[in-house]
C-alpha cells in the first residue's frame, strides 16, 4: 500500500494554523503587559500561564500516543473506522484528564502561593482546563493519525483564536487578572463544536487504535513522565525559574516575556507539526536517522537566522511591544534565547522519532535526563539571565544526546543491527490482546 503524504495545501494549512497560534499567543502577552499591573503580569506570565501550559504539555502525551495509535491502526487496516475496545480513546483521555485534575487540586497547597490573587479560583480554572484539554489533545492526535490535516489545523487555530477573543472580552469587561486566566482555559472547549458540527470531526471521534485501552493508557502514562520533563524546559520553565530566584524587579518580567517571544516563532509551528512529524516517521521506519536529519538541519538553520535577526532588531521590537520593560532585553540575550529554542526543537523532533519507533522508554529517558539537568542547573550561583541561558542550552542537548544514542544502539537504528544487549531502550512487543 502506498503511504499517504501531506500535500502542499495541507502543509500550508497547518503552517497557517501555527502562525495564527503564535500570533495569538504573542498578542495575549502584549495585551497582558499593557493592561495588567506589574504584580498581576508577574502572576499571569510567570505563574499561571506557564503552569497551565506546563500541565497541558504533560497532558499533550495523549496527543502524541493517539497519533501513533490511530496512525498505526490505519496502516495495519486501512478500512478501520471504529474502535474495538470497551472504552474509546476519547473516554480514556477524559479519565486521564480527570486524574491529572485531581492531582492538581490535591497538590495545590504546595504551589498555590504562587497565585497571591484569586488562589482558589486559579486552582479551579487549571483543574477544569486540564480535563477539557485532555479530550482536545486526544481529538487532535486522532485527526493527525487519520491524516485529517485540515481538521487538525482548524483545531489548533480555533483554540488560539478563542483564547485571544476571550482575552479581549476580559479587557472590555474590565475583568483584569481573573478574566485573563479564564480566557486561557476556556479555549480548550474548541473540540466540542468541531466534533458535533463536523463530519470529519465525527469520524475522527470514532477512530480506532492499534492497542487495547489499557495498553493505550499505559503508553500515555509513560509518555507523560517524559512530557513532564518537556514541560520544564518549554512551557513551565518560568514557573520553576521564579521559585529559584528572589528577583522581583521589572528585569525578571522582561526576561520571562523574552523567553516567550523568542520561543514562539520556532516552537509554535513545530508543535503544530508534531502530528505530521510522527506520522512521517511512522512511514520511514527503515531509515529513522536519515528521516530525522533533514528537519533537524532546517530547524537549526532557522534558529541561527532567527538569532541573527533577534540580535539586530530584537531590542527595538521588544521595546515597542513591551514598553513597560523598554531597555531590559539586550540583543545578545534575545539571540541566545532564540537559538536555544531551536536546540529544544531538535530534542522535540528526536522525541517524536522515538515515539514513532514505539520506543517510549527511550523517549522518557531523554526528556527525564534533560529535565533533571535543568532543575540542577537552576541552582547554579549565576545571575538570572546567565542561569536561564545555561539551562536552556545544556539541558536539551543532554536529552537529544540520550535519545540519539538510544536509537543508534537499537535494532531500529540506521544499520538495522542491534548493539543494545540490555533491552533498556526497547519496549516489550504488544501481545495479541493488546492489538485487539
Residue positions per predicted region:
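Membrane-interface junctions at transmembrane-helix termini in multi-pass inner-membrane proteins
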Residues: 132-154, 168, 339-366
